[in-house]
Amino acid sequence: MAFFLEALLGGLMAGMLYSLVALGFVLIYKASGVFNFAQGAMVLFAALAMARFSGWIPGWLGIEDKFLGNLIAFVMAGALMFVLAWLIERLVLRHLVNQEGVTLLMATLGITYFLDGLGQTIFGSDIYQIDVGMPKDPIFLFEGVFEGGVLVNLEDVYAACVAALLVMVLSLFFQKTSTGRALRAVADDHQAAQSIGIPLNRIWVIVWFVAGITALVAGIIWGSKLGVQFSLTTVALRALPVIILGGLTSVPGAIIGGLIIGVGEKLSEVYLGPYVGGGIEIWFAYVLALVFLLFRPQGLFGEKIIDRV
C-alpha cells in the first residue's frame, strides 16, 4: 500500500506541473481562439530570464540576501514577460484580428522561433540553475501507519503546492472578475466583444501577460528540477495530451487532465512497465490522448462544436 501511495502522490504532483503548462495554452486559446505553439518557448524564455537575473542582480545591486535577490529577479522577469506580451499584441495580433485560425497558428510558430533566438542572444545558451530555496531532500510520511513510511520528494511537494495555488487564483480570476468575463467574451466572438465596448487589444495584452506569468512559474519549477536548458521547450509537448484530455477551452479541464495523466503515467510505469519492458511513462499520455481524439475530440470538459446547416 505504501508503494502505491508513493506512486500516486508522485503522479499527482507531476500532474499539477503538467496542468500549469497546459493552462498557458488554455488561456491564450480562450482569449484569442488560437492554439499557441509558442507556450514552450515562453516557458524557456521566462526561465532563462529568471536564472540570469537571479545571477546578475547580486552584482548589480550589491544584494547578499538570497530571498530578496530572487524576489527582485522574479519581478524583473515578470516585467519582461509583460513587455513581451505588449510587443506580441502590438506587432503581431493587432494586424491579424478576425483572420483564419491557421494564420494565427503560423504566427505563434514564428513567435516560437523568435523567442528561441532572442533568449539565446540575450541570456546565452549554457545550462543554468535556478535556486529558489526549495528543499531537495526526500522525506518519509505516514511512518506510523505504514512500515517504513511513504517516500516523498519535498521539492515536488513545494512545486505542486505552488502550482495548485496559481491554478486556483487563475480559476477565480476567470470566473469571478469582470476582466475574466471579458476574456471569455472575446474568445466567443471578437467582433461582438468589440461592439459592446470590450477593448480587444488590451484584453490580448492581459491574457498573454497572464500566460507569461504562468510560463514563468512553470519555468522556475522545471528549471529548479532539471536546470534551464533549451530542451525545456519540450515541456510544452508534455502538456499537449493534457489539453486534449481536459478540453482546450476549459481551465478546470486542464487541471483534471493534468492530474489524470500524471497519475496514469506513474501507475502504469510502476505496475505495467515490468511486463512490457518499461518506457510506458514516455508514451502513455499520447496514447490516452489519441483515444480521446477518436471518441471524444472535445475532451472531458471542452465545448462540443455543433455545425448548423
Regions found by a protein language model. Give the residues of each.
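Alpha-helical transmembrane segments within multi-pass membrane transporters and channels
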Residues: W60-I111, L118, I256-I261, E265, ...
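Membrane-embedded helix boundary and interhelical linker motif in transport proteins
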Residues: A31-L87, L91, G149, L272-Y275
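Single transmembrane alpha-helix segments in multi-pass membrane proteins
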Residues: F4-F53, L87, L91-T103, I243-V251
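Inter-helical junctions in multi-pass inner-membrane proteins, predominant
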Residues: A2-L17, V152, F173-S178, W204-I243, ...
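Membrane-interfacial amphipathic/re-entrant helices at transmembrane-helix boundaries
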Residues: M1-V21, A49, I57-F74, Q99-T103, ...
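Transmembrane helix-bundle core of multi-pass membrane transporters
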Residues: H95-L96, G101-K176, I203-I206, G227, ...
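Helix-loop-helix "hairpin" substructures at the membrane interface of multi-pass membrane proteins
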Residues: A14, G148-V228, V251-G257
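Glycine-rich helix-loop "coupling/hinge" segments at transmembrane-helix boundaries
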Residues: Q39-M42, S224-V251, G257, G278, ...
